[in-house]
Amino acid sequence: MEHSRIIGFFSNFATFLWNDNLLPVGVLTGFVSFFMTENRPYILISNDDGYQAGGLNFLIDTLKAVADLLVVAPDGPRSGFSTAITSAHPIHAVLVRKESGLTVYACSGTPTDCVKLALNRYIERRPDLVIGGINHGDNSSVNAHYSGTMGVVQEAAMQGLPAVAFSLCDMSAKADFTPLRPYLIDITMKALMAGLPEFTCLNVNFPKCPKFEGVRICRMARSRWINEVKDLDNAGRSGDWYWLVGDCQELEPDATDTDRWALSHGYVAVTPTTLDNTATRLMPMLKSLF
């Protein structure tokens, strides 16, 4: 309990100082590391952009001072794989980095495969937390259903582990993750301290801006993708060729309690999600029919 109080105090204090430009990054990570030298948390990390992605490596650099990290990530981009698993052929993994408190594997499978492999073969002990990300791109609203980053944390939640997905609304390979650092530590520490109910996880999205207005706890906005298919010249190839593209259509643009609203107004959007897809509101009507 004392350890939890220290974590809670520090995460709030660090974010306050950072927001007022009073706490340099080196002091931030050093101060956390001082309190975490014993009984360091053990965190499993994966993503859908691959083990070489900037977002993943920024996350590693941020959290390695406060936790022991096991990273099992795809060996290349796997965006849009959601919770897909590989069953038609074997997968393989290669150790690509090993140092004190950090082990990194590159896996040929999907993000969900990576979590399954880690939990069944590579963990030293049961992880205290599983993190997906940092994703290059927006995983708010309906995007969460397609996301391999969310696939990571959903698989963890299925296994009874607390899990958090981090995404930045910037698809650039050279995206600037610097403003995220204190929030990554703060949210990670709070997730470690408080835990999460079984079969739930957090979807955390950061807007693309140099400084955030704060954190908003919000629901998923209702939206859908439209204009999703673009014709492509077949260039002599057989059959019809297309690009899957599209525009995200907001279905409730005036709602102020959604992740899309929070992001558009400069807030970090934290959305609690659940694995239970039951439409409970439909049950009374269906029972009356059957």
Name each model-derived stretch.
Residues D138-S147:
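Glycine/threonine-rich flexible loop motifs
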Residues I45-Q52, N143-A144:
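Short, glycine-rich nucleotide/cofactor-binding loops
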Residues F177-F290:
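Electrostatically charged, flexible surface regions
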Residues E38-N39, I43, G54-R121, R125-R126:
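A cross-family phosphate/adenosyl-ligand binding-site feature
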